[in-house]
Regions:
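Radical SAM enzyme [4Fe-4S]-AdoMet core and its adjacent flexible, acidic
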Residues: 13, 207-228, 274-278, 338-369
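Conserved SAM/AdoMet-binding glycine-rich loop
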Residues: 78-80, 87, 92, 190-314, ...
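Extended hydrophobic-aromatic, low-complexity segments
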Residues: 258-259, 272-273, 284, 296-299, ...
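Conserved, mostly hydrophobic/aromatic
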Residues: 181, 198, 234, 262, ...
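Conserved beta-strand core positions
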Residues: 6, 43-44, 149, 196, ...
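Proteins enriched for Cys/Gly/acidic motifs involved in redox and nucleic-acid/cofactor modification
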Residues: 1-206, 245, 256, 260, ...
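Terminal RNA-binding accessory module
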Residues: 346-444
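Active-site proximal loops enriched in glycine and acidic residues that flank catalytic Cys/His/Asp
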Residues: 200, 236, 264-266, 302-306, ...
Length: 444
């Protein structure tokens, strides 16, 4: 298999990307060459997502598109893994004959075996119990292309929200042992990674299964000891599970970004109850107020679901008022997607798609105004910015501050004729604001 060219298509979330990078590491160690050409690829791997309807459609389209190269191209192995592979294991093999191998979400460490079997003339399927964690010892391949990387600290989820299929596809919550995470982080830091973004289905309760109590604060303290790292960012924090030691560590450790991603989903108590969320509107207000009192400069991001079954005009209006009052720095909105096998999909009073889209647009229009106002308040402030690249044909660079998570938030555009290198940190005085981005110049 030496020098076989492999194309990897990683769909969906950042957690899926981490799995893809681990698989790539194993394959590169065994002589595979990475390519971005469908025509040249001898092995094509699609790491799929099916969290919502649109993600499922994207996965199907990619599989069917790559199947063409399996039929009439260089491709000798077409392999499908990820959440769609776990959920529709039999359908994929039976209905798409071009697919040679299917690996479940907890079986991606068998990718080398799968390729070997297919090259030997067999089709391959592997679905491990959703209990332990896949084990790949090879060095992970960093694919983000910048100076940040994701560190997946746990797999699975125990929440069982009524709209979500993830616990069925990823299994119960399993933390990655701390020593493994530290070793992985050190390796990435040696590859010029300066920002680590901690991800999981939920990061807040990291370690509860291994150490008997939430231990994210202890992990943060260990990661902060890695000299080459500048920023450590936390995504996917459930508000009800944020605990005092975590907040105290964020305050004490300068490398930990004053940034939290809190996926609240809604603010009406009845909707939250039927979603299976373990919090209330007042508890959300109290937690947000607490975080802002402890860290006045904290950036809060959230995600919402609009059009949940039975959501009334009044409940939607309540959500709008809540968002207006809370002034989240960053916000994303999904329209509710009924997922087969979830309690919410069987609920009465499903909302029309047009109504969902209208409500989503209302929320995003409100957030756009909030974001523009918050940006205006930033004018005159000085921020530390990590340069990510140059703006084409202009004396300007694009970067991010601690308030900007990669891939989902805005940018800081830095006007300067001075040459800068990706990964540089510069102090920037903010001189202007767009709806989601800031403009500044290097402080003198």
């Amino acid at each position: 298999m030496n020098n076989m060219k492999i194309l990897f298509i990683s769909l969906g979330c950042d957690k899926n990307l981490v799995d893809s990078e681990h698989m790539l590491g194993l394959l590169v160690e065994h002589g595979f060459e990475i390519t971005d050409s469908e025509e040249d690829a001898e092995v094509i791997v699609i790491n799929t997502c099916c969290f919502i309807h649109d993600a499922k459609e994207e996965s199907i389209q990619n599989i069917l598109e790559m199947a063409k190269y399996r039929t009439a191209g260089s491709c000798k192995v077409l392999l499908v893994t990820g959440c769609m592979a776990e959920r529709y294991r039999d359908e994929i093999i039976e209905e798409i004959p071009e697919v040679d191998a299917v690996l479940g979400t907890n079986s991606y460490d068998k990718i080398l075996d799968a390729i070997q079997d297919v090259l030997g003339g067999d089709r391959f399927q592997e679905y491990a119990d959703l209990k332990g964690l896949p084990k790949i010892d090879a060095q992970r391949v960093v694919t983000t292309g910048g100076h940040y990387e994701y560190l997946k600290i746990a797999e699975g989820c125990d929440k069982h929200c009524t709209y979500c299929i993830i616990p069925k596809l990823r299994g119960p919550y399993r933390s990655v042992p701390m020593e493994e995470l530290i070793a992985e982080a050190k390796t990435m830091a040696e590859q010029s990674v300066k920002e680590l973004v901690l991800v999981a289905q939920e990061t807040t309760i990291y370690g509860i299964d291994l150490y008997g109590k939430p231990s994210l604060h202890l992990l943060l303290k260990e990661l902060c000891k890695i000299q080459e790292l500048y920023w450590i960012r936390i995504l996917y924090c459930y508000p009800e599970d944020i605990y005092p030691e975590l907040v105290q560590t964020m305050k004490e450790e300068p490398k930990v970004c004053h940034y939290l991603d809190l996926p609240i989903q809604h603010a009406n108590d009845e909707i939250l109850r039927r979603m299976g969320r373990r919090t209330s509107k007042q508890e959300l207000i109290d937690k947000i107020d607490f975080l802002r009192s402890e860290m006045p400069d904290i950036t809060l991001r959230t995600t919402l679901i609009t059009g949940f079954p039975g959501e009334t005009k009044e409940q939607h209006k309540e959500l709008l008022e809540f968002i207006n009052d809370m002034e989240f720095d960053r916000l994303g909105v999904f329209t509710y997607s009924p997922e087969e096998g979830t309690p919410a999909a069987a609920m009465e009073h499903q909302i029309d798609e047009e109504v969902k889209l209208d409500r989503q647009a209302e929320l995003m229009e409100l957030q756009q105004d909030i974001s523009a106002e918050l940006g205006e308040r930033r004018i005159g402030q000085e921020l530390l910015v990590m340069i990510e690249g140059k703006v084409a044909d202009e004396d300007a660079y694009v970067g991010r501050s601690q308030a900007d998570a990669p891939g989902v938030d805005g940018y800081v555009f830095v006007n300067t004729p001075e040459a800068r290198v990706s990964g540089d940190f510069v102090r920037v005085k903010i001189t202007g604001a767009l709806e989601y981005d800031l403009i500044g110049e290097i402080s003198q």
